[in-house]
Each structure stands twice: as C-alpha cells, then as structure tokens.
UniProtKB/Swiss-Prot annotation:
Cofactor: Zn(2+); Fe(3+)
Catalysed transformations (reactions): 4-imidazolone-5-propanoate + H2O = N-formimidoyl-L-glutamate
Keyword RNA-binding among record annotations: no
UniProt record similarity statement: Belongs to the metallo-dependent hydrolases superfamily. HutI family.
Species of the source: Salmonella heidelberg (strain SL476)
Gene that encodes it: hutI
Cofactor, how bound (note): Binds 1 zinc or iron ion per subunit.
Identification of the protein by name: Imidazolonepropionase
Residues given in the record as 4-imidazolone-5-propanoate binding sites: 83, 146, 179, 247, 324
Pathway: Amino-acid degradation; L-histidine degradation into L-glutamate; N-formimidoyl-L-glutamate from L-histidine: step 3/3
Binding site for Fe(3+): 74, 76, 244, 319
Residue numbers binding N-formimidoyl-L-glutamate: 146, 321, 323
Intrachain S-S bonds: none
One Pfam family recorded for the sequence: Amidohydro_1
GO molecular function, one term: zinc ion binding
Length: 407
C-alpha cells in the first residue's frame, strides 16, 4: 500500500488521458489510476489498488475521465466594444482588407479601448477569462495590441497582470504592439515601428509586464522588413517571439519568425512547404485558429498534411477577439479544427494541451499529466476525450483542478 504524506491529495478511480506522447494508447489513456498531488504538483500516478479506498483528502471520481487542463495559447482577451457592424458589412460583400482601409478593423477596437477605463477593461476581460475557465482552461495567453500607443498598451498589460494576480488561471501575457499601424501613424508605419522598437518593447519589458513579443506580418499589417525590426529588438533583449503570419497571403512571415526561433507561427493558412520546413528547423509551433477562418469565410486552409509530414507540433487556440473570432470557447475551436482543417480529435487535444504549452514555452511544466508537472487538470462527466470535441455546445466539466485545488 502506498503511503501518503500529510497534505497529499488524491484523485482515485479515474480514467486518465495523460496526453503523454511516450504512451502508446490513444490520448495516453489508462484506466483505474490515481493521482497523488503534493504542493500544487503531480507527485505520482499509481494504480488505484495501491491506495486506500477512502480517507482525508481522497476524492473518488467513480471512473470519470481526467485530462490535463486546457491551454488557450492565442487570445486577444482585453478590449472594449464590439465589431458587429463590420461583420454585417462583410456579410454584405465587404472584404477584411477594405474595412481596414476605411479605418475599421483593428483600429476601430483601438479607439474604443483607448477610451475605456482600466477597471472597466478588467471587468470585461475577467468575465471572458471565467468563461474559458468554465470549459477547463487552466493556462491562458493574453495579447495586448488594442492600444498601439505606450500608455494604452501598458494599460492592457496591467489588466492581464491583475487577472493573473487572482490565481484563478495562469496568464501568459504577450506584447502585440506591432498589431496594426495606428491612425496617427497612417502615413508613417516605419515611424510607428520605431516607436515600438525603441520605446514600447524596452520600457514595458523593464516593467516585467509581458513574456513574449508578437507581431502581425501581413498585407494589412507589417511587411517582412518592419516585422524583422521587431524581432531583432526583442531577441536582443532576450525576449521570446511569435507571429501572426500567412493568414491572408504568403509573405514569408513563418520563415522569418522561425529564423528567430519563434515560439509559434499563428494562422498559417497560406503557409508553404518552405515555411513548414523552416518551422521544423526553428522549433516553432504552428498554431491553428479555425475561428477566424470560419468567421472571415476564408477558403485557404492551413497545410495540415505538410505539418504532419515535417512533424511540426500543431496547437489549436480560440483567437478570441472582437473582429475576426468572437468565440470565447476552446471547445468550439477544437471542433472547428477537426471539421474545417481535418485534424483528428487526438490532434485537437494535443493542440490544446502539450503543443499549446510548447507554444507558450511551458512544455516542461504544463500540458501533460506526468509526475513533476503542475497539478492542473480537469475531471469530465465523459468516457472518452473525443466527446468534448464532438459536442462543443455541451460542457461535461465535472471538476476543474488548478494548482492542486478544486476551483
């Protein structure tokens, strides 16, 4: 009989989907297991017959499914306003590029966000965060990018820090100052990139407000040369990088980000084989964002088969934002990734667990159920992981465990 230490907590009688790639079973499934949690981490995984049937801090899950906590590795959670009117325009034939050229798109949200009080932004973002938590999310990336000026970018990152301080969910904050050219720099995008590189990145990094730098390398964003200035600035300071790339066209953004050992290349609908090979060589995760593909009614799908062939890890994220993916649901993103992009349900699960952790640089502590990893996991009223992907309108979450505590 396994001896427990004072303070240990046990979840027994579980069907465990570890998402550990070293296990041969689909999803890393193993039955009749018990998790021993100690000081917020998984201490051990043992057959339940090795543990007492009952006792203090022993939870009998009656055969329920347990998976790692979900990870949403790409969101734009902090913003004000909505862009419902633009959506209606698009349904009436206007393109995303046309709307952006008319002052809509990202800049419309920038105006609303700049005008919004920090406390209001916090309350809006907190409600969104808790919606994701209710689906089993335990680690969440939050990008800035709706300020496009130093003061408001800092305000957005302070909101992310305040959310993190609640200890309800892990937050990975990302500086996305190079999201779009603000109206006041419309005729001088290079001047805006200078502001980003010489002021925003170093000052906000010094304040410890973000973990990584992101950018939007696209025909309606920044060109390759401008994007590289951002990457060079970040890497000179030792800051991890990532990029929104190849969403609407093939510019070579994935190759660029991979050359700087980017954590991830996101969207990647127009990615080609050269870019896929560069991602493999750079250790860069491909992040699929099916919500934006669906909402923009795009037709160019990411090259999933190429990513498989080159063994590039593929993550899946909600891309929750007001303009192109107003879906605050990682379950829905998993379903869309399967239906629209052809992922298998197991690939979708890997995409919101171990591969999503890698996209945030957290692969040594998050995204799998293994001894030594964080005790972030979800108990489901389900028999198989595929059920969560199959029926996104139903949430079978039974219990969410964060840092070893039921939350």
């Amino acid at each position: 009989m396994r001896q427990l230490l004072p303070g240990d907590t046990v979840w027994r009688n579980i069907r465990l989907a570890t998402m550990d790639p070293q296990q041969q079973a689909l999803y890393g499934l193993v039955d009749n297991q018990a998790l021993i949690v100690r000081e917020g981490h998984i201490c051990d995984i043992v057959p339940e017959t090795q543990l007492p049937v009952s006792g203090d801090n022993i939870h009998d899950m009656q055969g329920r499914l347990v998976t790692p906590g979900l990870i949403d590795c790409h969101t734009h959670l902090v913003f004000a306003g909505n862009r419902a009117a633009e959506w209606e325009q698009r349904l009436n034939g206007a393109s995303y590029q046309h709307i952006s050229a008319q002052g809509g798109g990202i800049n419309a949200t920038v105006s609303a966000t700049r005008a919004c009080a920090e406390e209001t932004l916090y309350l809006l973002a907190r409600e969104r965060m808790m919606r994701l938590a209710s689906e089993g999310v335990t680690l969440l990336e939050i990008k800035s990018g709706y300020g496009l000026e130093l003061a408001t970018e800092e305000k957005l990152l302070r909101v992310a820090a305040k959310l993190a301080a609640e200890n309800a969910i892990d937050i990975s904050p990302t500086l996305l100052a190079a999201h779009a050219t603000p109206a006041e720099y419309r005729d001088d995008p290079d001047g805006y990139i200078t502001l980003v590189c010489e002021t925003m990145i170093p000052q906000l990094w010094q304040k410890g407000l973000f973990d990584a730098v992101d950018l939007f390398c696209e025909s309606v964003g920044f060109n390759v040369a401008q994007s590289e200035r951002v990457l060079q600035t970040a890497k000179a300071l030792g800051i991890p990088v990532k990029g929104h790339v190849e969403q609407l066209s093939l510019l070579g953004g994935a190759q660029l980000v991979s050359r700087y050992q980017g954590l991830s290349a996101d969207h990647i609908e127009y990615l080609d084989e050269v870019g896929v090979a560069a991602m493999r060589d750079g250790g860069t995760v491909g992040v699929l964002l099916p919500g934006a593909f669906y909402f923009l009614r795009e037709t160019q799908r990411p090259p999933v088969e190429l990513l498989r062939r080159y063994q590039v890890p593929v993550a899946v994220a909600s891309d929750f934002n007001p303009g192109t993916s107003p879906f605050c649901s990682l379950h829905l993103a998993m379903n869309m990734a399967c239906v629209q992009f052809g992922l298998t349900p197991e690939e979708a699960w890997a995409g919101v667990t171990r591969h999503a952790a890698r996209a945030l640089g957290r692969q040594a502590t998050h995204g799998q159920i293994r001894a030594g990893y964080r005790a972030d996991f979800v108990v489901w009223d389900a028999e198989q992981p595929v059920e969560i992907v199959y029926e996104p309108g139903r949430n079978p979450l039974y219990q969410r465990v964060y840092r070893g505590q039921i939350s």
